[in-house]
UniProtKB/Swiss-Prot annotation:
Pfam families reported for this sequence: Stress-antifung
Family: Belongs to the cysteine-rich repeat secretory protein family.
UniProt protein name: Cysteine-rich repeat secretory protein 55
InterPro entries: CRR_secretory_protein, GNK2, GNK2_sf
Gene name per UniProt: CRRSP55
Keywords per UniProt: Repeat, Secreted, Signal
Gene3D superfamilies hit by this protein: Gnk2 domain, C-X8-C-X2-C motif (3.30.430.20)
Taxonomic classification: Eukaryota, Viridiplantae, Streptophyta, Embryophyta, Tracheophyta
Organism: Arabidopsis thaliana
Top-rank taxon: Eukaryota
Gnk2-homologous domain sequence ranges: 22-126, 132-240
Signal peptide: 1-20
Cellular component terms (Gene Ontology): extracellular region; secretory vesicle
């Protein structure tokens, strides 16, 4: 698949109680000559039913679906963000399964990302393989003014070194989160997560690739999200992971523009 990076210039919402029905990104491999046959389509529906029913209990599921002779096999993965409830996970996966069939019609290589979950299926076996070939970057258009830029870089780097090292530990299931005070009145919040099919090494490599955008596309910005099929990293100047502090959230405001880049 051709590498595709999407960079969205976004004045981010001040609150993260995002509805699961609002997808962030979907990728349908329309460049591929592989389209879903009738049997593959049935296998996809069967696979999605399994992901919808099985993912919420543990927040993660991989599965396959094939016909009686093991031809036209489809591989699938679903994962919820590690800080959300089983109920929110279930809602998100249901929405993802429904929408991916609407936006990626007749495609046998598709993925969809929400703030709370990620779902993917393909006829190629992608399970356990690092994938940073396609991604999405969101960042706040406002620059950091509350702290010296060099100090901010150092604090941001230290926070993500900490939460990345936590996320790769098997007991944490790919999730790391934390915060640090930049000033008495400003707190930097960060979260990372990789898909739980990855090895510790591949998870760390995905994080390194994603966090690299903090010093380029997102440099000195007040918020940034870098999203790949294999991992997710984010920082904000407001609480966005659960449990939220309602006293520190605010209304959603913003302007969105985007540019698609390809090699």
């Amino acid at each position: 698949m051709k590498t595709l990076v999407v960079k969205c210039f976004l004045l981010l919402a001040l609150v993260c109680s995002c509805r699961a029905a609002d997808s962030i990104w979907q990728l349908c491999n329309t460049n591929s000559n592989i389209s879903a046959s009738s049997q593959v389509s049935k296998n996809i529906d069967s696979l999605l039913a399994t992901l919808v029913s099985k993912t919420p209990s543990k927040g993660f599921k991989t599965t396959t679906s094939s016909s009686y002779n093991n031809k036209e096999k489809v591989y699938g993965l679903a994962q919820c963000r590690g800080d959300i409830s089983n109920t929110d996970c279930s809602t998100c996966i249901q929405d993802a399964a429904k929408k991916i069939r609407e936006v990626c019609q007749n495609q046998s290589d598709s993925r969809i990302l929400y703030d709370f979950c990620f779902l993917r299926y393909s006829q190629e076996n992608f399970i356990g393989k690092l994938d940073t070939g396609a991604g999405l970057i969101y960042f706040n258009v406002a620059n950091v003014t509350e702290i010296d830029p060099k100090k901010f870089d150092n604090e941001l780097g230290a926070l993500f070194d900490k939460i990345r090292s936590e996320a790769v530990l098997p007991k944490n299931k790919g999730l790391g989160k934390g915060k640090t005070k930049l000033t008495p009145f400003v707190t930097l919040n960060g979260l990372v997560q990789c898909t739980r099919d990855l090895s510790e090494l591949d998870c760390a490599q995905c994080f390194a690739t994603a966090v690299g955008s903090f010093m380029t596309t997102c440099h000195n910005k007040k918020g940034c999200r870098v999203l790949y099929s294999s991992c997710y990293v984010r920082y904000e100047f407001y609480p966005f992971y659960f449990p939220l502090d309602p006293a520190k959230t605010g209304p959603s405001v913003g302007r969105i523009s985007s540019v698609h880049l390809s090699p």
